[in-house]
Every structure is written in structure tokens, then in C-alpha cells.
Amino acid sequence: MGIRVLTLSDVETPAVYSSRIRSRFGNTDLVISCGDLPSYYLEYVISMLNLRLYYVNGNHVQRPESEDNAERYEHPWGAINLHRKVVYDREHDLLLAGIEGSLRYNDGPHQYTQGEMWRMVLGLAPQLASNRVKYGRYLDVFVTHASAAGIQDDIDKAHQGIDAFRWLLATFNPRYYLHGHMHHYNPLKPNLSQFGNTTVVNTYGYREIEI
């Protein structure tokens, strides 16, 4: 049996933020958030399921009324931030990496140009190459908020995909690519697709996958 992963992004859902979360998701092994969710929501999931939670921030960050709590709102207690990191989860024998945010379209937080995204992605490359030597593979799961260029993205500036993400997928062939940001209300738009050997998942709301 594979690793059962609960993926989250963008909107709070009653199925997750519920007193019945343990009965609904009690067989989950790991939680991954792709951004734009408040810290209290992620902390609730961590405390109720007692599981490790990896995350990246989205481009919408809820600001606290008091600056004393600012750090907590961007970095939920007990969660592991994947932004610009390559992480080996020893318990699940899983290699993860992540990049936060979206393409820059206004002066909001966690927005970057294509060039800035390239620099961050290329910064992951040495450790991904090292993974190949140590573990026999580059990467299992790539986690972002925005989508990759030409893969479940859109034409407007805010939702254009990231060129560097597409390059990473083509170069390092992770088994799974998880992203948020794309609010798909149209059932005809796919939330699950394939790019080469990589399964691409839009995690809008929540999805349960097995890795």
C-alpha cells in the first residue's frame, strides 16, 4: 500500500474543518498544503489528525490584526515550510521540494517574476542532483502554489503558469506535482492530468491521493 496523502489549498472546506475530521480522514499518512489557507485551519488539521504537514504559502496571506502574531499567520505552528527547500521524509521514504507564491501581478505578498522563479528553482537543482546519487531518484513530490506553464494554468496574468516549474518537471521527473491557485468551478476543466511521467494534481479544496 502506498502513502495516503491529504492535499489542501485555497478554500476551507466543511469536510476538513469539522469535528468529524478523524473519522473522515483517519487513515491519512501525510498532509500537504499548496497555499492560500489560514494558519488556524492548517493547525486544526495537524492537531486533530496528529500528522506531519508540509506547506508552501500562496499569494494571498491573511494579515493579523496584531503584528505580534504576524509570524504565526505565515508559518503555522507545527507545519514544515517547503519553500526553496528539498526535504527527505525518512518515515515515508519521500523526497519533497517546494516553491511558494505566484507570478507577480500586483504589489501583494509572495509574488515573483518569471526570472525570480527561475532563480529559486535553479537553487534547488544541486540538491536534487545529490538526491539521485543518495537515493537513486531526484524527487518524488514537487509542491507549489502556482501551476507550471501550459499545465492546468490560465491566460490571465495572475494565473499564468511558471516556466521554471515546467522545466523542473521535465528535467527531474517527480512522481507527483501538487499545486493550488487554480479555482476550477467548471467540471470540464481537469484537476488531474499527466505530464510525462508526472501526475499533476490541482489540490483546490482538498484531494486524497495515494503515492
Where are these regions (language model features)?
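Conserved catalytic scaffold of divalent metal-dependent phosphoesterases
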Residues: 7-16, 57, 61, 69-159
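Short, well-ordered coil/turn elements that cap or connect secondary structure elements
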Residues: 26, 48-50, 74-77, 82, ...
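N-terminal active-site segment of His-dependent metallophosphoesterases
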Residues: 1-48, 130, 134-138
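Metal-dependent catalytic neighborhoods of phosphoester/phosphodiester hydrolases
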Residues: 18-21, 37, 41-50, 62-77, ...
